Amino acid sequence: MDKREEGTVEEPLDLIRLSLDERIFVKMRQDRELRGKLHAYDQHLNMILSDVEETIKVVEKDEETDEEIIRNIKRNIKMLFVRGDGVILISPPLRTS
């Protein structure tokens, strides 16, 4: 029996395969986060996502008080190619039994 038919997870990339055509969360280097629908991926974790919401965390320093100011910048992207070497983690959608 083919494991693709069973929907089982035997290898780490199987979990990503089960998330095809689902919304996923991707944490990237440089304090970037992506949420979007996964259309394709490869063994290097290169991915094609659609309807993406990108959140970038920006830390600025107030020159007068020397306090750090943290801002989140958000933008929406219709279609995005994600290069796998910048990926830290991928979280599949929550599944209910």
Swiss-Prot record:
Keywords per UniProt: mRNA processing, mRNA splicing, Nucleus, Ribonucleoprotein, RNA-binding, Spliceosome
Signal peptide: none
Domain Sm per the UniProt entry, residue ranges: 11-96
Keyword ATP-binding: no
UniProt-listed InterPro entries: Lsm3 (IPR034105), LSM_dom_sf (IPR010920), Sm (IPR047575), Sm-like_LSM3 (IPR040002), Sm_dom_euk/arc (IPR001163)
An annotated Gene Ontology molecular function: RNA binding
Single biological process term from Gene Ontology: P-body assembly
Domain of life the protein comes from: Eukaryota
Keyword Ribonucleoprotein: yes
Cellular compartments annotated: Nucleus
One Gene Ontology CC term in the entry: catalytic step 2 spliceosome
CDD domains referenced in this protein's UniProt entry, alphabetically: LSm3
Function of the protein: Plays a role in pre-mRNA splicing as component of the U4/U6-U5 tri-snRNP complex that is involved in spliceosome assembly, and as component of the precatalytic spliceosome (spliceosome B complex). The heptameric LSM2-8 complex binds specifically to the 3'-terminal U-tract of U6 snRNA.
Subunit structure: Component of the precatalytic spliceosome (spliceosome B complex). Component of the U4/U6-U5 tri-snRNP complex, a building block of the precatalytic spliceosome (spliceosome B complex). LSM2, LSM3, LSM4, LSM5, LSM6, LSM7 and LSM8 form a heptameric, ring-shaped subcomplex (the LSM2-8 complex) that is part of the U4/U6-U5 tri-snRNP complex and the precatalytic spliceosome.
PANTHER family: U6 SNRNA-ASSOCIATED SM-LIKE PROTEIN LSM3
Membership in a protein family: Belongs to the snRNP Sm proteins family.
Protein name (database record): Probable U6 snRNA-associated Sm-like protein LSm3
